């Protein structure tokens, strides 16, 4: 295959990935989708990002047994985008983002928890920046663009949507270390069927 043909294939793949992303983004935000679908959209986002920045972001995803579960639509891309903008982009030489999903039992034994972790090996945050994020997440009011950057407001939106659907004990938890990276954990009940948004596990019924 010639260089020109290779470029044609690359452009075609970019157009397809962009088209699928646009189609996904313009749908109703309140939809529940499979976790695997969310991961696929994240892969396409990072693919398009790497086309622009010469492949400086390595994305890894692991969701053994959890891909079939349902999650609120558009909860992962804002977190992954945040990881790139604030973690990987300021770091020389690029970096990696790991998205993992696992089902864990709660101590009370009543519900199972889906925990999705987004980790990057970027520049990390100092305590002041981390405190600002924690303050934003803990607040009852939506983030104000003049006070917070728009990526953080995207994280706040995801956090609030999860809590609205499932309860205040769920949502986002953030930890970070300067020079090591940032970890964002999304916690929600296991949802095994579309439309099940009450935090109850129907397994075995």
Residue ranges and their predicted role:
Residues 1-175, 183:
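Two-component histidine phosphotransfer core
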Residues 182-190:
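Short C-terminal beta-strand
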Residues 191-195:
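Short, charged/polar, Gly/Pro-enriched secondary-structure boundary elements
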Residues 196-205:
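Intrinsically disordered, low-complexity acidic/proline-/asparagine-rich linker or regulatory tail/stalk regions
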């Amino acid at each position: 295959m010639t260089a020109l043909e290779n470029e044609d294939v690359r452009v075609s793949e970019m157009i397809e990935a962009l088209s699928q992303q646009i189609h996904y983004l313009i749908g109703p935000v309140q939809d529940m989708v499979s976790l695997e679908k969310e991961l696929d959209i994240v892969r396409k986002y990072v693919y398009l990002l790497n086309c622009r920045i010469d492949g400086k972001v390595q994305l890894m995803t692991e969701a053994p047994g959890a891909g079939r579960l349902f999650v609120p639509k558009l909860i992962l891309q804002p977190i992954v985008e945040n990881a790139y903008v604030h973690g990987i982009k300021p770091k020389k030489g690029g970096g990696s983002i790991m998205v993992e999903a696992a089902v864990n039992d709660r101590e009370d034994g009543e519900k199972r928890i889906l925990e999705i972790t987004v980790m990057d090996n970027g520049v990390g945050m100092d305590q002041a920046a981390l405190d600002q994020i924690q303050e934003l997440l803990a607040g009852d009011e939506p983030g104000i663009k003049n006070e917070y950057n728009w990526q953080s407001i995207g994280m706040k939106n995801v956090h609030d949507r999860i809590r609205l659907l499932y309860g205040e004990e769920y949502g986002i938890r953030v930890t970070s270390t300067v020079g090591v990276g940032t970890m964002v954990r999304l916690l929600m009940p296991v949802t095994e069927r579309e439309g099940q948004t009450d935090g109850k596990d129907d397994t075995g019924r």
